[in-house]
C-alpha cells in the first residue's frame, strides 16, 4: 500500500464544556427523625444564603426590600417596665434591628421566626429573632428544632421548642408543661400547603445560578489572562483507551468549565503529519452572547420579585432613562403590592405575641413627596 493510500487512524477526544450547578431543590423529606428535612442534605436555606452572597442582582433586590420594609422608623409598645422603649430582650436587641432581620429572612427564605420567652407568671418577657436557617419543623408546624449545624448532620445540640400559643392557661399547667412553654417559637411562612416556606424567587433560581456562573467565568478568564479556546495535540501515537481517559480526565479537572474560563480539546495522533486541524474554533460574538445571557438572567430575577430595576439603582434600558415622577409612581405600586404585605405580616406577628392590635408601627420609607400611611 502506497503512502498516499495509507489509512491513518486519528484518536480524538473532546472535553465538553461543563457548567457545574449545585442547585438544591426545596424538597421536604420525612425521615425516621422527628423533623422534616428541608432540601437535599437538609440544607436548602444554606443554599439560598449562598446565592444571596454570590449573586449581585439577588442581593441588591433583597437589601433594597429590607430598607423599604423597615422604613424610616419602627416603634413598638414596651414589654412591661423591664426594658426601655424599643429594647426587646436582655441582650439589648432593638425592634428596628429585629424587623430588619425578619424582612431579610422573609425575602431570602419566604418566612421568619421569633423566639418568645415567658416569665414565671406566663407573661411575655422577651422576644428574640431566630435565624430561619437553623429552624426545622415537624409536619404539623407545632414542634420546632433548632441547630446551627444542620449541614453537618445536625444530630447533636438540637434544641426543641413548642409552637407559641398566646392564650395558655398558665395556672393550669404542670411544672413540666410550664418549663416546656417557657420558650417557644412563632413560625411565619408565605405558604400553607407545605411544611417550609418558599422564596419569591424560587422560579428564578436557575437564573441566579447563571449570573453566578458568568461572574465566576469572567473572574477566572481574567486570572487565566483570557487564554483562548485551544486544541491540544499529542503526536506520539495512540496510548490506548485507559491512558487517554486518564490524560483527558486530568486536563478536564484542571482546565475545563466556567470555573477556569476556557475550553480544551484533545487529539491523539500517530505523528505530527496526522495532527487535527481546526479553523475558527473561537466564537467571535462570545462576549456578546454572555452579555445577552447575563441581562436575560437579571431580568428573570427582577421579574420573580415583580420589581423594576430602576427602584434598585439599575436602569437596564439605558436609551430611555427615567424621571423622578416615574420613580415615585413605580415605588408606590411596588410598595403597595410587595412591601406593605410583608410589613403587615411582621406587624401581625407582634400583635399575636402581645395579644392586642397595633402594637408595632412602621414609618414608611420616605420619598420626597411620600404620602403613604403608617403600618400598625
Model features per residue range: what roles?
Residues 190-349, 359-364:
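A contiguous, surface-oriented mixed alpha/beta subdomain in the mid-to-C-terminal portion of proteins
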Residues 1-66, 70-269:
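Structured, contiguous alpha/beta core segments that scaffold functional sites
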Residues 373-376:
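Extended, compositionally biased alpha-helical segments that mediate assembly or anchoring
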Amino acid at each position: 500500500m502506497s503512502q498516499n493510500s495509507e489509512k491513518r487512524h486519528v484518536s480524538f477526544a473532546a472535553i465538553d464544556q461543563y457548567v457545574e450547578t449545585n442547585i438544591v431543590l426545596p424538597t421536604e423529606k420525612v425521615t425516621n427523625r422527628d423533623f422534616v428535612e428541608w432540601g437535599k442534605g437538609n440544607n436548602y436555606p444554606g443554599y439560598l444564603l449562598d446565592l444571596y452572597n454570590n449573586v449581585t442582582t439577588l442581593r441588591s433586590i433583597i437589601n433594597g426590600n429590607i430598607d423599604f420594609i423597615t422604613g424610616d422608623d419602627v416603634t413598638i409598645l414596651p414589654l412591661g417596665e423591664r426594658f426601655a422603649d424599643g429594647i426587646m430582650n436582655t441582650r439589648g436587641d432593638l425592634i428596628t434591628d429585629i424587623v430588619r432581620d425578619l424582612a431579610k429572612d422573609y425575602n431570602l427564605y419566604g418566612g421568619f421566626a421569633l423566639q418568645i420567652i415567658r416569665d414565671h407568671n406566663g407573661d411575655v418577657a422577651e422576644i428574640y429573632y431566630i435565624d430561619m436557617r437553623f429552624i426545622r419543623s415537624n409536619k404539623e408546624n407545632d414542634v420546632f428544632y433548632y441547630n446551627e449545624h444542620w449541614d453537618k448532620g445536625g444530630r447533636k445540640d438540637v434544641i426543641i421548642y413548642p409552637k407559641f400559643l398566646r392564650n395558655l392557661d398558665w395556672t393550669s399547667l404542670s411544672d413540666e408543661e410550664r418549663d416546656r412553654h417557657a420558650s417557644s417559637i412563632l413560625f411565619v411562612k408565605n405558604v400553607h400547603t407545605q411544611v417550609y416556606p418558599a422564596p419569591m424567587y424560587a422560579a428564578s433560581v436557575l437564573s441566579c445560578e447563571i449570573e453566578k456562573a458568568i461572574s465566576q467565568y469572567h473572574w477566572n478568564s481574567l486570572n487565566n489572562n483570557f487564554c483562548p479556546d485551544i486544541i491540544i495535540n499529542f503526536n506520539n501515537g495512540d496510548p490506548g483507551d485507559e491512558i487517554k481517559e486518564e490524560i483527558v480526565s486530568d486536563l478536564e479537572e484542571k482546565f475545563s468549565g466556567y470555573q477556569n474560563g476556557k475550553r480544551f480539546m484533545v487529539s491523539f495522533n500517530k505523528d505530527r503529519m496526522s495532527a487535527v486541524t481546526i479553523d475558527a474554533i473561537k466564537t467571535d460574538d462570545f462576549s456578546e452572547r454572555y452579555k445577552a445571557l447575563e441581562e436575560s438572567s437579571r431580568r428573570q430575577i427582577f421579574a420573580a420579585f415583580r420589581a423594576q430595576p430602576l427602584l434598585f439603582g439599575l436602569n437596564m434600558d439605558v436609551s430611555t432613562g427615567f424621571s423622578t415622577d416615574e420613580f415615585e409612581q413605580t415605588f408606590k405600586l411596588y410598595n403597595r403590592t410587595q412591601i406593605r404585605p410583608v410589613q403587615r405580616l411582621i406587624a401581625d406577628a407582634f400583635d399575636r405575641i402581645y395579644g392586642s392590635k397595633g402594637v408595632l408601627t412602621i414609618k414608611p420609607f420616605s420619598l420626597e413627596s411620600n404620602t403613604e400611611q403608617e403600618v400598625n
